[in-house]
């Protein structure tokens, strides 16, 4: 495995660890999710380019579309929560609280 793939996998793992550790604020969770999606996009693009598998060349673009949709929904949820509660804590999203 080359050094580039190791760096991308390390970036994914760091983003995943950040998502698991810093999940109190919605903004930090969204940033970690974006880091994960970016590393997945780069990994998929490099894998397809190195394997010369042209049939799957649309997969990174589809992944990028899903990342853009996730970012738009996450930011709209962040605006809604910050307007309603005044903070961006993830605990405000719990619908089971009394």
Curated annotation (Swiss-Prot):
Belongs to which family?
A: Belongs to the complex I subunit 4L family.
EC number(s) reported in the record: 7.1.1.2
Q: How does it sit in the membrane?
A: Multi-pass membrane protein
Q: Which GO terms describe its cellular component?
A: mitochondrial inner membrane; respiratory chain complex I
Q: Which UniProt keywords apply?
A: Electron transport, Membrane, Mitochondrion, Mitochondrion inner membrane, NAD, Respiratory chain, Translocase, Transmembrane, Transmembrane helix, Transport, Ubiquinone
Residues making up the signal peptide according to the UniProt record: none
Single GO biological process annotation from the record: ATP synthesis coupled electron transport
Name one matching Pfam family.
Oxidored_q2
| Protein's name according to its UniProt entry | NADH-ubiquinone oxidoreductase chain 4L
Q: Which reaction does it catalyse?
A: a ubiquinone + NADH + 5 H(+)(in) = a ubiquinol + NAD(+) + 4 H(+)(out)
Gene source species: Rangifer tarandus
What does the annotation say about its assembly with partners?
A: Core subunit of respiratory chain NADH dehydrogenase (Complex I) which is composed of 45 different subunits.
């Amino acid at each position: 495995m080359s050094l580039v793939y190791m760096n991308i996998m390390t970036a994914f793992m760091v983003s995943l660890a950040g998502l698991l550790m810093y999940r109190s604020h919605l903004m930090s969770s969204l940033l970690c999710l974006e880091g994960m999606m970016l590393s997945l996009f780069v990994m998929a693009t490099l894998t397809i380019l190195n394997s010369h598998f042209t049939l799957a060349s649309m997969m990174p673009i589809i992944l990028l579309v899903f990342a853009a949709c996730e970012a738009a929904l996450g930011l709209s949820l962040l605006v809604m929560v910050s307007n309603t509660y005044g903070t961006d804590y993830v605990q405000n999203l719990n619908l089971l609280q009394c």
